[in-house]
Amino acid sequence: MKPFLCFDLTNDKKNSVPNGEEFIAVKPSFASSQSLEDSKSDANEKLEQSKLPKPLRILQTVCGFAGFIALVGFLRSTATLSEAYQNAPFIFWIIAVCLPVWFVLLMLGLYRKKKVLSTEESIHALESLEGRVDAIYSELGVPENSRDADILTFFYKTKGDKIKICSKGAQIAPYLNPIYKVFADFENLYIVELGGKYVIPLSSIKGIRTVKKHIRIAKWNKEAVFNKGIYQQYKMNTDQYGTIHCRYYHIMEFELGGEAWEMYIPCYELPLFERLTGVKAQ
């Protein structure tokens, strides 16, 4: 089966086109796409201006890492304060210098970000981008009652009939979870991103199966906390990199264009897709 919305690097390590583009029924106009890119460029410029200069950001990272490592080492030590200083005085110097530098740079960064992003130019750039995004979704026919949903994607290579998930660049988790607009009618499931609207006939869906396998996904996109409220039942946790650990996931199987496809769904999105498709997971 072919993984939907995932990236096949078997024959092209630089491939950036996801599987399933042939199922895009509607794309935004060239003018809309160009306006979006212009707005993205303006917004990204303002966001970049809101950051500290790169050398200071590097210094902040180095000081923070070194300071906290030294602090953890000191706290775990069973030696007395005087013994610890005699054995490793440099640890005290690292803590005394690095942590204050890290904290000062953190505060400066927050101040700079707030100052730059509160200017009229920055506000206009960000509002313009939001308006362009809304305009494209409207052009693609996304209704107001559509829902935001994470869908799992990944880079992979094939060997025979087997799929091997791989990383690309400085990727911190094997599974990515971009946000799509999703909705359905009596005939189709619609999956929409700014590049176009995918259409999957409900009649093509063969089932949803549960895969009881631990996975790590890139980040948490929801406003609600991942381990509270409606999400507490999934018993997810996180790590020092901010990735989310899931105990299982789901695969929606469908046949389209003469091929068998699989769409990977994180555990916490299953109720939404069951409701939209009318198919219960097995």
Identify the function of each model-found stretch:
Residues 174-176, 181-225:
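Phosphoinositide-binding peripheral membrane targeting modules
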Residues 207-282:
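Acidic, Ser/Thr- and proline-rich intrinsically disordered linker/docking segments
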Residues 2-14, 18-53, 102-186:
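Anionic N-terminal interaction surfaces
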Residues 124-127, 192-194, 257:
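Short strand-coil-strand connectors
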Residues 43, 56, 63-66, 70, ...:
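Generic L/I/V-rich hydrophobic alpha-helical segments across diverse proteins
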Residues 59-62, 75, 82-101:
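Hydrophobic alpha-helical transmembrane segments
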Residues 53, 80-82, 88-89, 147:
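Intrinsically disordered, low-complexity coil/linker segments enriched for acidic/polar
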Residues 66-80:
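N-terminal signal sequences
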